[in-house]
Amino acid sequence: MRTPLTLLALLALPLHAAEAPATLLAQADKELLSDGLTSEAKAADWKVAKGKWVRTAEGIKVEELPADNHGAAGRLNQKLGDFIIAFDFRLDGAKSISLSINDAKEHMARVLITPAAFRIQRDDHDHDGPDKAVVFLNQAEKFAAGSWHHVVLEMVGDTMVTTIDGKNSGWGRDELFKTEKANPGLTCAGQSATFRNFSLWSAKAEP
């Protein structure tokens, strides 16, 4: 029996395919990963280093554990070129959350969100050395507990752009961003926050 080509095409699609996010800098190319982060969703290969992570019907609830002496952190073992990441978050008492991007050895960049502000930065890339973090944007913005918000991070070439809820955007540029990126991660300081609808796309610059 022959299988129709249309069926084969559908079977080749990733599970839980997400809609390509709206962007300012890049065009979404190929979907690399989609994880609803709920108890019903097919889980991506997250590596939890710190904290408590529990999948619920609403999303993955994340808490910092006092015994860890470190914020909750979970990462994907994923090498990245130019990319787009989109996800939703809800603060449920957390002091802060972040989306963090590394290279093979060190932190590279992050989007940090508190109940009162969000920050976009290139991270300190050598810890005890001369390098220092560079803050591209530190904007006052209220994120009320219990309300959902949407984040899109684009990194293409030497530029990163972050947009929250389709209206608040900031960008920065650094030569470091041209190097291979890896291990995108979510973090949470305090108790607690919930994440859902995480998607990762390869990207190409707008023509």
Question: Where in the sequence are the language-model features?
Answer:
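Ligand-recognition surfaces built from glycine- and aromatic
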Residues: T179-P207
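Short carbohydrate-recognition loop motifs
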Residues: K52-H70
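Short tryptophan-centered beta-strand motifs in secreted/extracellular beta-sheet-rich domains
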Residues: L37, I85-F87, W148-T162
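Secretory/extracellular carbohydrate-interaction modules
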Residues: L65-D126
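Short, aromatic/His-centered strand-loop micro-motif at the edge of beta-sheets
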Residues: D128-H150
